[in-house]
């Protein structure tokens, strides 16, 4: 048995392959795709399923399907009989239709082919059916009857049944089944075109002949009906006019439903007139040819409309299509829901990202910011406050979704039973050169002064001292005015402050500052009056001066503990420590050692062999080797722990200062050190802090207002001095950088473009060469390759060990950038007593020097009646006949003015010179 593909089967049936697959599935044939093979016998099984009710579906529109019953087989009579019947009875008028139409039963299938071309042409016009003279029984199928029966008298006819129209059914679009056999036509369409034609009804093109039923129930051929239809009168309406409804009423067909009213209207108005022009055979032939000619353009037009049904762009006229196309191209401004009008940011957001989230062009946001006085670009970061103001103008709300890292790292309060006593942390503070380090040296019984440049402590130190079995942790802070931040930091992490005041010097500025820092931190103060061994020492005067700051000695009725000591002679040191321990006992200092460690970075540096090294003061818990930790924007794992004497230890408890190795970078002094169990959590927190810090810096640098821009334009002559600062420890680098920034003035601006801990490297030299910068090294040296590169590139490297030397040199360098100040220096004056005219030279003033001296090539001004009429220089100076360099007071001389001859007797010539004086900051 031969097989056929589903796609070929669908093409034969004029259907889509999806419809064929669905039909095959209904009859039990398994076919999955269009390329599946099925038996040819399936075609026979498929035919009944295509039209189970014997009805043909004609799609008029995309949603309306008109069902029309198929006609029964008709036995066509002979042509002669047809002619006789046409001559015997003309067409009679149709009675009015009853309001209630009866049901129309289904009929047998009609013959698929027409007999001849004239009959085919008549079939096209057979939708208007002549009214039958006799009633038709609806139950019996139509059979062939004698032609003579058609001549029955009309008076005996029963009442004419009303015209039955097929109801218009609105349903979802379904594939329309087309008859497999269509009448042969000269312009036969292709398979694809056949599918399209089968989906909708084409007015004027009918694929089966329409029957004319006589009174006896017989069916006449379509050609007979075409001859019997009367031709219109002379005043009949034209092709496009509305037809006469009384002449177009079709008779009721027993076996089939009549065409719809819309079809009759189209047919009657457009196709009836051409067929009525001729008579007889010639009329039929001419009518058929005319119908074919006029049917072609209508077919293309209808096909085009049919195709446009499936394309929403082509609905309606071309003008409407263009309008719809232009409307679709326009940007629709939609208002998002309230929940979508909330923008969530983390601290800051860029202008471009904010515009993207609000669905607004970035240029519009930039314009709004310019109106607010901010000059920004699309990549500038906006802080939370600015974002709230800007978003509110466009109807948006902003939520700050920044992660509070303090809440993540915040520890729960310890239970009282878990707390144990801890050693006190004592910070030594005071004015420069009052003996702070000497006192600590005496307490530690170690010489730490030798390492201090110029006797000045330039970084903070942490030491652990044991006295009578009890430990005390000491923090030594600098006393120089530049180290204010260090003193403030030391006051925050300490329990007790020892204020060192020299007995021979009294209260000084840094002493007052230390008192203020201690009071601000709420830390008790123990005053150590040092240098009492000196003959000029006056401790009573010191106590009296301290009373002005609220520190009253206990022997005077106050609450301040004051101890007179001598660091050099080691006098009364134990008494000082006992007072410190007594104060600690009163404070009841306790901590929980059985928890994760938490502390503060006292100092940090970059060691060439060990990497980043941080001095940590543990405040809570116990720090152990191998712990994961996070410090500021850095994280890491504790690789090694060393105490203040350089000994390696495995753990550090509360109030113990240690050096920690293993961090990813050099942290800032004052950062909080937190120990964690999870390395992943430590890295995440460090990453979040880095992002937050970067966003804040971007927002800080991007805030340029119109006023600032105007000031920069106005002060275009401002000089810039760029420096790179490298130091041994982070605290010293911060102090040096801050000291340099304070030197900036309106005339010279100092920019610290880079700062870091460690030796001066090639990277630093490359940066300095690219940015025309000098490098300041504080207690560090350049590498060998860096030194060679600096000499090659011409980069200036300055090395210092004392901070105020670096500040003074940078200040001088800034002064060198300034233009010198011009100062006028008076030389002398001479009175013109005679005027001599010398050819080719001009007028020479015979003058008498009254005051000072006259110098050749000096600047001069000519005064007449004390009014300056000329200012230039002396071109010549002669004494008698000789050219001289100068003429002193009391002598006569000849003076020539450069390019000026309008001199008179009695004028005064005043000589002066311009001196350039270096500008001071």
UniProtKB/Swiss-Prot annotation:
GO molecular function, one term: translation initiation factor activity
Segments for region (G2): 455-459
Location of region: G5: 566-568
Pfam families with a match to the protein in the record: EF-G_D2, GTP_EFTU, IF-2, IF2_N
Biased segments, Low complexity type: 229-241
Source domain of life: Bacteria
Amino acids binding GTP: 430-437, 476-480, 530-533
InterPro entries: EF-G-like_DII, IF2_II, IF2_N, P-loop_NTPase, Small_GTP-bd, T_Tr_GTP-bd_dom, TF_IF2_bacterial-like, TIF_IF2
Region (Disordered): 81-118, 175-194, 219-301
Ranges for domain tr-type G: 421-590
Bias type Basic and acidic residues, positions: 292-301
Location of region: G3: 476-479
Keyword GTP-binding: yes
Record key words, sorted: Cytoplasm, GTP-binding, Initiation factor, Nucleotide-binding, Protein biosynthesis
SUPFAM superfamilies the UniProt entry points to: Initiation factor IF2/eIF5b, domain 3, P-loop containing nucleoside triphosphate hydrolases, Translation proteins
Compartments in which it is found: Cytoplasm
Biased composition, class Pro residues, residue ranges: 96-112
A GO CC term attached to the entry: cytosol
Family: Belongs to the TRAFAC class translation factor GTPase superfamily. Classic translation factor GTPase family. IF-2 subfamily.
Job of this protein: One of the essential components for the initiation of protein synthesis. Protects formylmethionyl-tRNA from spontaneous hydrolysis and promotes its binding to the 30S ribosomal subunits. Also involved in the hydrolysis of GTP during the formation of the 70S ribosomal complex.
Protein name, entry field: Translation initiation factor IF-2
Gene source species: Pelobacter propionicus (strain DSM 2379 / NBRC 103807 / OttBd1)
Lineage: Bacteria, Pseudomonadati, Thermodesulfobacteriota, Desulfuromonadia, Desulfuromonadales
GN (gene name): infB
């Amino acid at each position: 048995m031969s097989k056929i593909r589903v796609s070929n089967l669908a093409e034969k049936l004029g259907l889509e392959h999806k419809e064929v697959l669905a039909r095959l599935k209904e009859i039990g044939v398994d076919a999955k795709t269009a390329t599946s093979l099925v038996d040819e016998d399936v075609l026979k099984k498929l035919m009944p399923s295509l039209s189970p009710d014997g009805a043909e579906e004609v799609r008029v529109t995309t949603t309306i399907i008109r069902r029309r019953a198929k006609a029964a087989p008709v036995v066509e009579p002979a042509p002669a009989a047809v002619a006789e019947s046409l001559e015997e009875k003309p067409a009679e008028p149709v009675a009015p239709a009853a309001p209630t139409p009866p049901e129309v039963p289904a009929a047998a299938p009609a013959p698929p082919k027409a007999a001849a071309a004239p009959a085919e042409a008549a079939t096209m016009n057979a939708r208007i059916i002549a009214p039958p003279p006799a009633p038709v029984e609806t139950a019996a199928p139509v059979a062939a009857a004698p032609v003579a029966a058609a001549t029955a008298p009309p008076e005996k006819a029963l009442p004419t049944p009303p015209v039955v129209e097929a109801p218009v059914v609105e349903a979802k679009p379904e594939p329309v089944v087309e008859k497999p056999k269509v009448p042969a036509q000269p312009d036969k369409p292709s398979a694809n075109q056949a599918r399209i034609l089968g989906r909708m009804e084409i007015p004027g093109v009918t694929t089966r002949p329409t029957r004319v039923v006589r009174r006896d129930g017989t069916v006449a051929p379509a050609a007979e009906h075409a001859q019997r239809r009367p031709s219109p009168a002379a005043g009949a309406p034209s092709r496009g006019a509305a037809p006469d409804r009384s002449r177009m009423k079709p008779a009721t067909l027993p076996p089939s439903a009549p065409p719809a009213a819309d079809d009759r209207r189209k047919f009657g108005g457009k196709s009836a007139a051409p067929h009525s022009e001729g008579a007889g055979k010639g009329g039929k032939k001419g009518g058929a040819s005319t119908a074919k000619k006029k049917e072609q353009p209508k077919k293309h037009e209808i096909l085009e409309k049919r195709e446009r049904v499936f394309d929403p762009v082509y609905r309606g006229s071309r003008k409407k299509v263009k309008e719809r196309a232009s409307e679709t191209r326009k940007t629709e401004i939609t208002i998002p829901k309230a929940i979508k009008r909330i923008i969530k940011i983390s601290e800051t957001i860029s202008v471009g990202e904010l515009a993207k989230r609000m669905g607004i062009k970035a240029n519009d946001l930039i314009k709004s910011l310019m109106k607010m006085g901010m000059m920004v670009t699309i990549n500038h970061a906006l802080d939370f406050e600015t974002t709230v103001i800007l978003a509110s103008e466009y109807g948006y709300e902003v939520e700050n979704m920044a992660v509070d890292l303090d809440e993540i790292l915040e520890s729960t309060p310890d239970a009282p039973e878990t707390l144990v006593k801890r050693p006190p942390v004592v910070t030594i503070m005071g004015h420069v050169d009052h003996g702070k380090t000497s006192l600590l040296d005496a307490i530690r019984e170690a010489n730490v002064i030798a390492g201090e440049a110029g006797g000045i402590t330039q970084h903070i130190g942490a030491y652990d001292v044991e006295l009578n079995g009890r430990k005390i942790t000491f923090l030594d802070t600098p006393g120089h005015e530049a180290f204010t931040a260090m003193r403030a930091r030391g006051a925050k992490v300490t329990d007790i402050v020892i204020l060192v005041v020299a007995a021979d010097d009294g209260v000084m500025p840094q002493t007052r500052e230390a008192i203020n820092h201690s009071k601000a931190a709420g830390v008790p103060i123990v005053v150590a009056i040092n240098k009492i061994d000196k003959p000029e020492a006056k401790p009573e005067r010191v106590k009296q001066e301290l009373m002005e700051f609220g520190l009253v000695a206990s022997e005077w009725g106050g609450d301040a503990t004051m101890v007179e000591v001598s660091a050099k002679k080691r006098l009364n040191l134990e008494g000082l420590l006992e007072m410190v321990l007594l104060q600690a006992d009163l404070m009841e200092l306790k901590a929980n050692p059985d928890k994760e460690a938490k502390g503060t970075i006292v100092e940090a540096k970059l060691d060439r062999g060990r990497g980043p090294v941080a001095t940590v003061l543990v405040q809570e818990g116990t720090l152990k080797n191998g712990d994961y930790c996070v410090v500021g924007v850095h994280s890491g794992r504790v690789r090694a722990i060393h105490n203040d004497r350089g000994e390696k230890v495995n753990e550090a408890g509360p109030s113990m200062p240690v050096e920690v190795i293993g961090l990813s970078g050099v942290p800032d002094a004052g950062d909080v050190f937190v120990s964690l169990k999870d390395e992943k959590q430590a890295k995440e927190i460090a990453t979040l802090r880095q992002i937050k810090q970067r966003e804040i810096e971007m927002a800080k640098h991007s805030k340029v207002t119109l006023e600032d821009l105007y000031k920069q334009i106005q002060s275009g002559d401002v000089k810039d001095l760029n420096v790179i600062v490298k130091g041994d420890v982070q605290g010293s680098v911060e102090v040096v950088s801050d000291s340099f920034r304070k030197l900036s003035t309106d005339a010279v601006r100092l920019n610290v473009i880079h700062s870091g801990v460690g030796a001066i490297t090639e990277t630093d030299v490359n940066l300095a060469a690219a940015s025309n910068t000098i490098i300041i090294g504080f207690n560090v040296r350049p590498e060998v390759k860096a030194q060679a590169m600096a000499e090659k590139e011409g980069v200036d490297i300055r090395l210092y060990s004392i901070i105020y030397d670096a500040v003074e040199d940078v200040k001088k360098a800034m002064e060198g950038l300034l233009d010198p100040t011009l100062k006028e220096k008076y030389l002398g004056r001479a009175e013109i007593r005679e005027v001599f005219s010398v050819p080719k030279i001009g007028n020479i003033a015979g003058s008498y020097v009254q005051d000072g001296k006259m110098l050749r090539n000096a600047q001069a001004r000519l005064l007449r009646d004390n009014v300056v009429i000329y200012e230039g220089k002396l071109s010549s100076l002669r004494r008698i006949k000789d050219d001289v360099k100068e003429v002193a007071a009391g002598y006569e001389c000849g003076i020539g003015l450069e390019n000026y001859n309008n001199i008179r007797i009695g004028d005064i010539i005043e000589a002066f010179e311009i001196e350039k004086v270096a500008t001071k900051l």
